[in-house]
Amino acid sequence: VYLCRDGKPVSFRFEGQDYVITISKVSLYPQGYAAALTQGSLLDEPSVIVADIGGWTVDLMRLDNRIPNAATCRSLELGMIRCLDEISEQIRRGLGLSMTAAQIESVLRGDASHVNEDAKKIIYQEAERYTKRLLSAIAESGLDVRAMPAVFLGGGATLLKHHASAADGLCRPIILDDVCLNAKGYERLTERMSQKHEQ
């Protein structure tokens, strides 16, 4: 009810233009849900894990027959900032170098040829360690990444592209590294809801 503002108009300014709207209906969805629905290959899976890797946390849920299972929602404090901080600390300890998060991320994306080779080695080792720790934490939270597909999205999804594969037997990853995918998914959901409303 509070999101609809009791039917009262809401005024705001966006990009220099004034707007007055009335909110008639609100739909709420868990983080990452809309992005997962953009993947046609997942729609026939009975159960799918969705892991949204953000800066501070990794938000988890399981979709059962495309529907979010609220009982499986978890938030792990294993976001990319923790990963980058740990990598930075290991480089400082091992090599005496103080690398920035931007430098480390550049190596993780595979486009940092100018970085010290020993530092790269530590970055890759720590990224591998982080990936295994993350997959283990997901399993400990009751979601078996070996038994069902795991969709990874958010800022940290790119990291898993290089460090988790179905071949290693740790999980069945589907990496969604398009930062606009949630918006695209919400657009599809809105279109479907509008079509149902018109019928």
State each model region's role.
Residues D64-L95:
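Metal-dependent phosphodiester-processing active-site neighborhood
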